[in-house]
Curated annotation (Swiss-Prot):
Keyword Cytoplasm: yes
Organism: Mycolicibacterium smegmatis (strain ATCC 700084 / mc(2)155) (Mycobacterium smegmatis)
GN (gene name): gyrB
PANTHER family, sorted: DNA GYRASE SUBUNIT B, MITOCHONDRIAL, DNA GYRASE/TOPOISOMERASE SUBUNIT B
Protein name from the UniProt record: DNA gyrase subunit B
Function of the protein: A type II topoisomerase that negatively supercoils closed circular double-stranded (ds) DNA in an ATP-dependent manner to modulate DNA topology and maintain chromosomes in an underwound state. Negative supercoiling favors strand separation, and DNA replication, transcription, recombination and repair, all of which involve strand separation. Also able to catalyze the interconversion of other topological isomers of dsDNA rings, including catenanes and knotted rings. Type II topoisomerases break and join 2 DNA strands simultaneously in an ATP-dependent manner.
Chain positions of site Interaction with DNA: 484, 487
Quaternary structure annotation from Swiss-Prot or TrEMBL: Heterotetramer, composed of two GyrA and two GyrB chains. In the heterotetramer, GyrA contains the active site tyrosine that forms a transient covalent intermediate with DNA, while GyrB binds cofactors and catalyzes ATP hydrolysis.
């Protein structure tokens, strides 16, 4: 449904607000409410306020949301919805104070104020208030402007301002640095989430502005698909005065999920001209789906419930998968594209190269887990399956040429799967001949406790030799890579599994891949990719990350993957122990500190620039990169699966122009270039 104001007379007032619980435990245990006090938890504050604004749009009462990161680090979220009620509540305080100071107080419990919502689960704007040093709320409703502030959650006195015919809510908050490890918001993280929300709410305009840009930074004003978006007074003023020193993006997608699928497939080659899109409604349920196959080998299916990104899927995805597998097999047999004696195509065969977005709206959602990553409503599966069966069957019958292309791709995938199974069996037989069923070149650790064991995947034989000699063999295993690992983004699974290095990695980890993946069989809970600090080493690391993301994604999702950070420089002092620097800035700092202390650098070889791991002996490698007491490891996390999928497609896929554009666009962010 396009974002249009709903002028229905539904009353939204003090009686709509129900209190469930107070705020006592929030500051004491913030992780219980926002997941963590790190960067992810910090951004969760924005999501909570934005979710409330988007709920107004979903209910038909708002058409735009404006998000601004101020120069002082505070965040402002403004919508043109109905405005938070300000009249006196039954508790004896202004209703806005109830909303801001009582946990789980809101208008989402009666089933009428909001038919569906995404901003309720676990927290709400009251938790944002609890975790902020200050929060300011400006409300436009009942013909007036209202202002309220909260100093460490304690409300001031509600003030009535001038008259206005507009409606809406503006929330501005300052995250508490005593609670959070950082209060520095990531612009791209915020932009991706807001773009996602705009895709999911057809016609809604979401504008993001970042005022923290320094004078030296280039203006980054990216506006896409906004032809139908109404311009604000600020936008008109900006056009008149020219660009300002801010980052600014506007998201507006009249096509909704169709535009989302176009976005996912924009760096890939679609094998069908049209994008399949359909929707359906039932008592308390709605579903909307858009999908299109591409020539690639990876599945890219993204699911949402009440605009919440359900990373772990759930019953809506199960219903979609079951219907898709059934419809394609039935169509293939009916049209003789599969012989009667041929085995059915599997779901994996059919979903190869599929880009799809599934969005459901559920009146009484049941989310599994505190962070709402899996939908648990059992009735949703049958509802989605029924709609998909009807709509997909109709599309296949109405588009025989494109349907045949889709089926042929699935048949080709099945043939590759059979070849891959033979390759896997070959890997198993080969590994069985090695000692303990493990790769012969693996130097295993003595510990048999996976939670205490580490696997270093090391580029090159020489570095592998140094790592074997320098490691702590009690808990550190070493797997050297002798040859070049295959780019899995450009190869089908049967070719991938014939690659010797891939075979070694899969066998060493023990989990299997794809549908055979079993994380309980993981032999090392910390997998460290250790490559040279130059361009070639970074390429090797990217190839390995692509393999892990495409074939063993739960390892990334569960935080088992790390990148080693070997030093770039060795500083040799006269009559003093050498020091190691991991960046140009650290090198300069060590030089300045050393000289200030009266130390002198060696004349001939005082500053050694490492070109590769092989230049370090075993002792140096241990002291700088492998010793748990001093090493630096960067954990690989997966906050946005769609963004990660897109990035791997751009960097490792076939589209050269997309890769060139990405590099050009991000060149200004490169600080160190090894040439």
């Amino acid at each position: 449904m396009a974002a249009q104001k709903n002028n229905a007379p539904k009353e939204y007032g003090a009686d709509s607000i129900t209190i469930l619980e107070g705020l006592e435990a929030v500051r004491k245990r913030p992780g219980m409410y926002i997941g963590s006090t790190g960067e992810r938890g910090l951004h969760h504050l924005i999501w909570e306020v934005v979710d409330n604004a988007v709920d107004e749009a979903m209910a038909g009462f708002a058409t735009r949301v404006d998000v601004k990161i101020h120069a002082d680090g505070s965040v402002e979220v403004r919508d043109d919805g109905r405005g938070i009620p300000v009249e006196m509540h039954a508790t004896g305080m202004p209703t806005i104070d109830v909303v801001m100071t009582q946990l789980h107080a809101g208008g989402k419990f009666d089933g009428e104020t909001y038919a569906v919502s995404g901003g309720l689960h676990g927290v709400g704007v009251s938790v944002v208030n609890a975790l902020s040093t200050r929060l300011e709320a400006t409300v436009l409703r009942d013909g007036y402007e209202w202002f309220q502030y909260y100093d460490r959650s304690v409300p001031g006195k509600l003030k009535q301002g001038g008259e206005t015919k507009e409606t809406g809510t503006t929330i501005r908050f300052w995250a508490d640095p005593e609670i959070f490890e950082t209060t520095d918001y990531n612009f791209e993280t915020v932009a991706r989430r807001l773009q996602e929300m705009a895709f999911l709410n057809k016609g809604l305009t979401i504008e993001l502005t970042d005022e923290r840009v320094t004078a030296e930074e280039v203006v980054d004003d990216v506006v896409k698909d906004t032809a139908e978006a109404p311009k604000t007074a600020d936008e008109k003023a900006a056009e008149a005065t020219g660009p300002s020193k801010v980052k600014h993006r506007v998201f507006h997608y009249p096509g909704g999920l169709v535009d989302y699928v176009k976005h996912i497939n924009r760096t890939k080659t679609p094998i069908q001209q049209s994008i399949i899109d359909f929707d359906g409604k039932g008592p308390g349920h709605e579903v909307e789906i858009a999908m299109q196959w591409n020539a690639g080998y990876s599945e890219s299916v993204h699911t949402f419930a009440n605009t919440i990104n359900t990373h772990e899927g759930g019953t809506h995805e199960e219903g979609f998968r079951a219907a898709l597998t059934s419809v394609v097999n039935r169509y293939a047999k009916d049209k003789k594209l599969l012989k009667d004696k041929d085995p059915n195509l599997t779901g994996d065969d059919i979903r190869e190269g599929l880009a799809a977005v599934i969005s459901v709206k559920v009146a009484e959602p049941q989310f599994e887990g505190q962070t709402k990553t899996k939908l648990g409503n059992t009735e949703v599966k049958s509802f989605v399956q029924k709609i998909c069966n009807e709509q997909l069957q109709h599309w296949f019958e109405a588009n025989p040429a494109e349907a045949k292309t889709v089926v042929n791709k699935a048949v080709s995938s099945a043939q590759a799967r059979i070849a891959a199974r033979k390759a896997r069996e070959l890997v198993r037989r080969k590994s069985a001949t090695d000692i303990g069923g493990l790769p012969g070149k693996l130097a295993d650790c003595r510990s048999t406790d996976p939670s205490k064991s580490e696997l270093y995947v090391v580029e090159g034989d020489s570095a592998g030799g140094s790592a074997k000699s320098g490691r702590d063999s009690m808990f550190q295993a070493i797997l050297p890579l002798r040859g070049k690992i295959i780019n899995v983004e450009k190869a089908r699974i049967d070719r991938v599994l014939k690659n010797t290095e891939v075979q070694s990695i899969i066998t060493a980890l023990g989990t299997g891949i794809h549908d055979e993946f079993d994380i309980s069989k993981l032999r090392y809970h910390k997998i460290v990719l250790m490559a040279d600090a130059d361009v070639d080493g970074q390429h090797i690391s990217t190839l390995l990350l692509t393999l892990l993301f495409r074939f063993m994604k739960p390892l990334v999702e569960n935080g088992h993957i790390f990148l080693a950070q070997p030093p770039l420089y060795k500083l040799k002092w006269q009559r003093s122990e050498p020091e190691f620097a991991y960046s140009d800035r650290e090198r300069d700092g060590l030089l300045e500190a050393g000289r200030a202390a009266g130390k002198k650098i060696n004349v001939d070889d005082g500053i050694q620039r490492y070109k590769g791991l092989g230049e370090m002996d075993a002792k140096e490698l241990w002291e700088t990169t492998m010793d748990p007491s001093v090493r630096v490891l960067r954990q690989v996390t997966l906050d946005d699966a769609a963004a990660a999928d897109e990035l791997f497609s751009i960097l490792m896929g076939e589209d050269v122009e997309a890769r060139r554009s990405f590099i050009t666009r991000n060149a200004k962010d490169v600080r160190f270039l090894d040439v």
